[in-house]
């Protein structure tokens, strides 16, 4: 229902977010312009191979050209996937450390049998925590008018979040003896 409302509201330069909040967006003038915007964005993201879970978390925000909130929703989708895979209820760095950190992580992105693989696991933890710190925390606390997010930057971040989703999907649950 929200998607149908947002299609109509796009002509007034408005959109309803998943939270139910009404926000401003760049207005479209014609139905073909609204369709073109959505099609171009889908094509851009499809050409990058963006993970479908990323798109499902921020579809409405992208259609409304609301890149600020699209980034927030996409990054939140990573934490949600980690919680789903592990059963943990934490958030942010604590969630990442509990799921991917230590000598016997709950989720491993590789066999953890060499120093290089252990280093890669630590690097993935740092990537996740850095992304949460830079994009989720910033967008959650900074007003949108002070924190600009261009379409190009949003697409780049969505590609990185897509990589995170693929790595989390492929992660194994090593023995925790």
Predicted regions mapped to residue ranges:
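Structured adenosyl-cofactor binding patch, chiefly the S-adenosyl-L-methionine
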Residues: 154-171
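Amphipathic, well-ordered alpha-helical segments in soluble domains
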Residues: 73, 131-135, 160, 164
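Short helix/strand-capping connector loops at secondary-structure junctions
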Residues: 134-146
């Amino acid at each position: 229902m929200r998607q149908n409302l947002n299609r109509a509201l796009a002509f007034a330069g408005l959109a309803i977010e998943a939270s139910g909040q009404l926000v401003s967006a760049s207005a479209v003038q014609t139905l073909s312009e609204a369709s073109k915007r959505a099609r171009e964005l889908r094509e851009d993201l499809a050409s990058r191979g963006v993970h479908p879970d990323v798109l499902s978390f921020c579809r409405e925000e992208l259609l409304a050209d609301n890149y600020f909130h699209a980034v927030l929703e996409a990054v939140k989708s990573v934490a949600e996937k980690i919680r789903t895979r592990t059963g943990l209820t934490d958030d942010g760095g604590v969630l990442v450390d509990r799921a991917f950190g230590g000598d016997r992580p709950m989720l491993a992105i590789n066999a953890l049998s060499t120093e290089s693989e252990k280093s890669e696991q630590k690097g993935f933890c740092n990537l996740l925590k850095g992304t949460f710190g830079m994009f989720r925390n910033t967008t959650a606390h900074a007003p949108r008018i002070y924190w600009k997010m261009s379409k190009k930057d949003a697409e780049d971040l969505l590609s990185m979040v897509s990589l995170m989703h693929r790595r989390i999907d492929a992660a194994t649950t090593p023995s925790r003896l």
